[in-house]
Amino acid sequence: MTNRLQGKVALVTGGASGVGLEVVKLLLGEGAKVAFSDINEAAGQQLAAELGERSMFVRHDVSSEADWTLVMAAVQRRLGTLNVLVNNAGILLPGDMETGRLEDFSRLLKINTESVFIGCQQGIAAMKETGGSIINMASVSSWLPIEQYAGYSASKAAVSALTRAAALSCRKQGYAIRVNSIHPDGIYTPMMQASLPKGVSKEMVLHDPKLNRAGRAYMPERIAQLVLFLASDESSVMSGSELHADNSILGMGL
């Protein structure tokens, strides 16, 4: 199946690397015009030059409401009315309840959670007349906290709650806007690689249906396929839903 997003306009935050990069490429391949934003301007500009005229890059601090306003205006001025928003940008910082630093916790909330709040607000404002899909990147840790990443877990739990609140609000207001979240266990991105303990190899953590069924990490393109599903009309009956890409971890309580 191709061209599932023909005629659609999408914005992907954190789109210059990792999952965001794979999402940008996949949505373009399915016919959408795709804007992507990132704090890394050099990487973003280089990628935009490679992707062609149906894409555009905007430097974006997702924790800044002023930046959001500028980005939304620039995207719609050049590409047209927004149909799909992927709130993907985020950070991962360690810290348990005894040793975690308040400044790290505040930064996690600002980038992982406040950005989604602002994005949903501005996404709804842009789509309420025409409809669309908002997709928030959460984590399995929103339901199964990681003790060494207490602040990160809390920031993603808030994303889960914000998603449901936004979906309910859109329904009650009569907006044809769907709001859903994706909850991966692990994604093998540069950010994850940097956090792995010494001696832990890609093969040890990566899920493989034949070689490592217990693996808890997935390649970014697998998660991008879930984003495509939620962005397309194939998921038209879904709003306020959570897609768990966790290989049954929640059911096992691990």
Curated annotation (Swiss-Prot):
Keyword Manganese carried by entry: no
Enzyme class label: oxidoreductase
Record keywords: Lipid metabolism, NAD, Oxidoreductase, Steroid metabolism
Active site: Y152
Record EC number: 1.1.1.51
Family: Belongs to the short-chain dehydrogenases/reductases (SDR) family.
Record note on quaternary structure: Homotetramer.
UniProt-recorded name of the protein: 3-beta-hydroxysteroid dehydrogenase
